[in-house]
């Protein structure tokens, strides 16, 4: 059972501010306008962009995408911000994942969606970040046309295989770390919601970071944040306790995600907790007050145990950076082994087949 040393005394929970109606963000022509952000049926434009470029041409595609070109196959995901649909281009036959967000939602969520669009606009050139091909605003909804990752997420993978072996985990970690190096060092972005369900996989064995709805852009790579957003299970202790945090909070979340994939359960839960899980506050208190989880040394290699410990440190400065972790012995151990993650995920049933 989860044991807690003391009560969690610090937790920043903010009272929602008075919200502005969606109509206050719309121009006379129906364009959604929020600061430097403009979005309509034709696409996205950031007025702060030096080139003033409009996202009317679909990225990395030799054909254009409009709302009329896409037909819905089925809903493949739901969340607080909207739904994700599997859609097909009527004329080309290519599949995409389209996130549709109705804008009659809380203003805080609306701001997160705007943030996601801005980050996707800048980050789609990284091969380890899910590509956002196009986005538009129409009939009160934002739509993001995203790369379709046909094997779902790491959460879908472990749902079928229960645990992932070290060689495959090394391949997963390297790809996620390359994505984090790009986000942290080039885009100055803290993802803030790294977890198995936000690490997507395709049949080729490519792993990509998705869902930037709660990401935070920083002015420099030395910046810090002090807001409480993201999925609490994978939050670092400093974020839960309301302290400032930086890129190292993503490293904690990565370590938690990788360890979960290895042992087949959330690291702070023992086997008996699966049937009677702790409450929200008990789990938060355990993450802040208890020693961090470790990989069992009798089940895993010293390299893997060391990698997990390099990520899951209570003291943020003690965590390795994404760049340092790329040269960790666990990553290097399998680099010349020609490990093909596609072999593992290729044997699995695509999640779209069992989602209703």
Swiss-Prot record:
Expressed in roots, stems and flower buds. Higher levels in shoot apices and flowers. The modification Phosphoserine is found at residue 221. It catalyses: L-seryl-[protein] + ATP = O-phospho-L-seryl-[protein] + ADP + H(+); L-threonyl-[protein] + ATP = O-phospho-L-threonyl-[protein] + ADP + H(+); L-tyrosyl-[protein] + ATP = O-phospho-L-tyrosyl-[protein] + ADP + H(+). The keyword Lipoprotein does not apply. SUPFAM superfamilies: Protein kinase-like (PK-like) (SSF56112). GO terms for cellular component: cytoskeleton; phragmoplast. Activated through serine and threonine phosphorylation. Disruption phenotype: Plants exhibit a dwarf phenotype with fewer flowers, large cells with multiple nuclei in various organs and large malformed pollen grains. Defects in the formation of the cell plate. RNAi MKK6 displays fewer lateral roots. Pfam families: Pkinase (PF00069). Interacts with P.syringae type III effector HopF2. Interacts with MPK4, MPK6, MPK11 and MPK13. Interacts with ANP3. This is Mitogen-activated protein kinase kinase 6. The gene is MKK6.
């Amino acid at each position: 059972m989860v044991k807690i040393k003391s009560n969690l005394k610090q937790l920043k929970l903010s009272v929602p501010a008075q919200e502005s109606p969606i109509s206050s963000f719309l121009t006379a022509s129906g364009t959604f306008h929020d600061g430097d952000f403009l979005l309509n049926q034709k696409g996205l434009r950031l007025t702060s962009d030096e080139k003033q470029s409009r996202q009317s041409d679909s990225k990395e595609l030799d054909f254009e995408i409009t709302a009329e070109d896409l037909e819905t196959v089925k809903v493949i995901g739901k969340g607080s911000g909207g739904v994700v649909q599997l859609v097909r281009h009527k004329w080309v036959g290519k599949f995409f994942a389209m996130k549709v967000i109705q804008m009659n939602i809380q203003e805080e969520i609306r701001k997160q969606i705007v943030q996601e669009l801005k980050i996707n606009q800048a980050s789609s050139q990284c091969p380890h970040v899910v590509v956002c091909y196009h986005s538009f605003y129409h009939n009160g909804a934002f739509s993001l046309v995203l790369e379709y990752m046909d094997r779902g997420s790491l959460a879908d993978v472990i749902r079928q295989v229960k645990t992932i072996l070290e060689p495959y985990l090394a391949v997963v970690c390297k790809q996620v770390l390359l994505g984090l190096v790009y986000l942290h060092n080039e885009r100055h972005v803290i993802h803030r919601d790294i977890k198995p369900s936000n690490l997507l996989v395709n049949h080729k064995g490519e792993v990509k970071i998705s869902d930037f709805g709660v990401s935070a852009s920083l002015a420099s790579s030395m910046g810090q944040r002090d807001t409480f957003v993201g999925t609490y299970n994978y939050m670092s202790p400093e974020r839960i306790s309301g302290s400032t945090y930086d890129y190292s909070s993503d490293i904690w979340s990565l370590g938690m995600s990788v360890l979960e994939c290895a042992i087949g359960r959330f690291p702070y839960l023992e086997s008996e907790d699966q049937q009677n899980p702790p409450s929200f506050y008990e789990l938060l208190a355990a993450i802040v007050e208890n020693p961090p989880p470790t990989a069992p040394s009798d089940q895993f290699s010293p390299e893997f145990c060391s990698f997990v410990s390099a990520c899951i440190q209570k003291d943020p400065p003690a965590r390795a950076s994404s760049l340092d972790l790329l040269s960790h012995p666990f990553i290097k151990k399998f680099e010349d082994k020609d490990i093909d993650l596609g072999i593992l995920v290729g044997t699995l049933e695509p999640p779209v087949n069992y989602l209703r």
